Amino acid sequence: YEIASCLVGSEMCIRDSWNPAIRRFFLKGGVREDRLPSPQLLAEYRLLSSRLQAVAVTRCMADRYPECTCGEHTLLNNIADCERTVNAMHACLLKVPWSGSGKGLNWCLHGFTKPVSNWCERVLREQGCLTAEPIYNKVKDFALEFYSDGQGEVRFAGYSVFSTNEHGAYTGNLLASDGQIEESIACCLSLEKLTGIREALRAELASIYGNTYTGYLGVDMMVCRSDKENGYRVHPCVEINMRMNMGVVARLFYDRFVAPGSKGCFAVEYVPDNETLRARHEQDMHDYPLTVEQGRLASGYLPLVPVTGKSCYRAYVRI
């Protein structure tokens, strides 16, 4: 059926992210051009979605908060720079400027090997540059979520504490209030410093995205162990996710559907064997019966998608 039939009145199409192919898909589905971003705007979005934006923001935050931040990005424009930097750092993480979430990463643990060289040459040929970062002694992944109104204003939308697998791909989120998340970070970074960094980030994002982009922005951060006095530092801008992201989904889910004071997890799980997946699902249904209080989840397991005889994934919350 036509996608246009789903839109009512002056409603606009809101995607988790945009590209020209998605725009063509909506046009083919009957959506009017005035409800979609223009090709010119998509070209601006492409520049704004580059990982190079995170490089600039990290430097800005490090200049403002040198006593409590870490974060180093080296921009590489040719294969000689790649070899020199990788060999000097011994172990590092290479990133392409544009890629999907959790993708476009190369963990260099054994120097500038032939596979690493081939990967760098391909990225330089296709995208023109890449970045190198140290591998940090990470304690916790978290994010600050923001919303840009496209009219110059960016507002804070909440915190996200998330988990990833060994390849950096997303696996889940903590379900907790903003206050509970602040408490969990406070052992590593004072609330005063956290709110200062949050406001500085908000202002910086407003100057970069505020007048062009309408939608959510997620700034991935991490707490790292340090040899400095307090033992911890925060990386203020690992990535900028210029889209609706899973951290926002978890934040909104908690605020709308979870009983105040409760905590839990929001998870996406891949299990290649369907029988094993269904067994886990049925065991969780048995072990964590769902309890609802005053229309909100107080405890238990809730699958967010059907687990069928063909499923290899499940998405669920457990309170």
Residue ranges of predicted features:
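Phosphate-binding site of ATP-dependent enzymes
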Residues: H90, K114-T171, M222-C237, N241, ...
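A long amphipathic alpha-helix within ATP-dependent nucleotide-binding catalytic cores
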Residues: E126-Q127, P134, F156, G168-Y232, ...
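Single conserved hydrophobic/aromatic residue that forms the stacking wall/gate
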Residues: Y1-G9, C13-I14
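ATP-dependent carboxylate/phosphate-activation module, predominantly the ATP-grasp catalytic core
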Residues: F146-L201, N241-V268
